Amino acid sequence: MILAILALVIATFLYGGATTVQAGCRDTLTSLSPCLYYLNGGSSSPSWSCCRQFSTVVQSSPECLCSVVNSNESSFYGFKFNRTLALNLPTACNVQTPSPSLCNTGGNVPTTLPANTPVGSPRSAPSPSGTTSPANTPSGSKKFPLSNESSSKSNVIILSFVSIALVLAII
């Protein structure tokens, strides 16, 4: 009898924890609704609000990306979107995505990006005189860091992430 009660308590705890994570990611993914118009081919580039929200989600909730990292679908729950545009979202928004290897840590995915995650490559910056000169600081902003050259695997994460966001926005 004690073992049955213990099993029930553990099952309730585990189920409740999973619901909390899903609800958190569901809310996070639905916050990408400003990207829907772009992802359905309604515009040639994502809106500023889409990119801002996408960057915020990538920076604050990369664990939500892992829930869909292995998905190769271009539709969820009957909602279809342009897969090519979804794969291009990090580039179109100049947002660097976390490495997909972070999702393969046995469930121990960080809830924020590591402190040493690079934000881009050097770019020209205005000098005090107003002219442009090379700078040794990362380019882009904290909200919109530049994508690195080897982001093809990261694009898979983003595609999956955006796919779930689109589905959840409709539901």
Swiss-Prot record:
Glycans are attached at residues 72, 82, 148. It is found in: Cell membrane. Keywords: Cell membrane, Disulfide bond, Glycoprotein, GPI-anchor, Lipoprotein, Membrane, Signal. GO terms for cellular component: plasma membrane; side of membrane. Disulfide bonds join 25-66, 35-50, 51-93, 64-103. Belongs to the plant LTP family. This is Non-specific lipid transfer protein GPI-anchored 19. It comes from Arabidopsis thaliana.
